[in-house]
Amino acid sequence: MSPTTAANQAKKLIKVPEMRRIKHIHFVGIGGAGMCGIAEVLANQGYKISGSDIKASKTTQQLEENGIKVYIGHEAENIKNANVLVVSTAIDPENPEVKAAIEQRIPIVRRAEMLGELMRYRHGIAVAGTHGKTTTTSLLTTMLAEENLDPTYVIGGLLNSTGVNAALGESRFIVAEADESDASFLYLQPMAAIVTNIDADHMDTYEGSFDKLKDTFVQFLHNLPFYGLAVVCGDDANIREILPRVGRPVITYGFNEDNDIRAIDVEQDGMRSHFTVLRKGREPLRLTINQPGLHNVLNALAAIGVATDEGVSDEAISRALKGFSGVGRRFQVQGEFELGEGNVKLVDDYGHHPKEVEATIKAARQSHPDRRLVMLFQPHRYSRTRDCFDDFIEVLSQVDQLLLLEVYPAGEKPIVGADSRTLARSIRLRGQVEPILIDPVEGNLQNIMQNVLQPNDLLLTQGAGNVGAISVELAQHHLYVK
């Protein structure tokens, strides 16, 4: 047996202790991106899993196909015989299942606390940051898999290569996204952590204080053991600011020369990016990632930092990047549709913060320099639209044609001056692009597509709300242009 094979086998076949007295776990809001993955992993560990959601979806259908009982609608009787309830921050305290659990003295835990339990007896790797978590988590998972380390993973989007966002592996490794939106990532105690960047988002959680947000990231990194590892983006000014307070082993990555891991000679080739990675004590390594944009090169560097430290070979890293098929709704090509003498290419992306939208626009420009860029954008949350209003005006003015959906509330009440009509008016006053408001309920989507789209356009559907479903609808109906 080779040393590599022996080492790999030593990292596998870990027996994970079960949670005492817990047999039946019920998830309130099981259809959520963060909830369904944990539910599936626990089901595969042998727990009885049930859950409820406000409406049926592809996710709830998939869960039922995998043997998980899903109730549509929230009722007290749904939690019968459950030993614990798992809830997300989106669940109202007045939810009948939550109230019933309180009355019956059934423990109620937050999603991240249950994720922390999954991580407790494994070698946990948590990926945090305002942007890029899902892609970075997926890249690292793919690298570990290429080294035959078979990790458990819980990701916030569908990994295109497997068609799922979570799976139970046989090794001691677990890779998971760490959610800062409600500060619940403080429940996690990983062995290694990535922080991709720190930006002002979800500020209601932090009482509007950016300093509190940064302090919370410091707390998160302090959850690492003193022998753990933090891999952080050294190009990010806010990360550099907190580094003196981290007090844990740190590796920095980025494009700047003072980083421990950096990318040089970056080239864009359509939907692919080529770069050379420099690491201390190693030969330069030329790599290709099957994704466009400098932000994805940074995501790759983060994953490379942890993978290298965990003993993943350069060959496995190279294979993982070259074969990476992406994550659902992350610059996902929906198809090309004939129009006149050319075609329109439809791409769907989940990014909803101004910096994410800007990175997507840059990737679109770099990968499709000869196409006119038409963006169908749906702002996500009134609070984010309010807090990032000026940034949205600047970023959305960078496209050639802007189509605006109304704000997706995500449970929030409307805020005066933070709606799409006001945003459109401000963008119009800037004078770079003429926004068009779309109301699918009124049925003007079809007419606007027919009047706006031109041969060889790139149509980018952008946002975290139901704009993804609208993108699917557009693809199914040939963009309404045929």
UniProtKB/Swiss-Prot annotation:
InterPro entries: Mur-like_cat_sf, Mur_ligase_C, Mur_ligase_C_dom_sf, Mur_ligase_cen, Mur_ligase_N, MurCDEF_pg_biosynth, UDP-N-AcMur_Ala_ligase_MurC. Keywords: ATP-binding, Cell cycle, Cell division, Cell shape, Cell wall biogenesis/degradation, Cytoplasm, Ligase, Nucleotide-binding, Peptidoglycan synthesis. Its main location: cytoplasm. Its EC number is 6.3.2.8. ATP binds at G129, T130, H131, G132, K133, T134, T135. It holds the Pfam family Mur_ligase_C. SUPFAM superfamilies: MurCD N-terminal domain, MurD-like peptide ligases, catalytic domain, MurD-like peptide ligases, peptide-binding domain. It is found in: Cytoplasm. Belongs to the MurCDEF family. This is UDP-N-acetylmuramate--L-alanine ligase. The lineage of its organism: Bacteria, Pseudomonadati, Pseudomonadota, Gammaproteobacteria, Moraxellales.
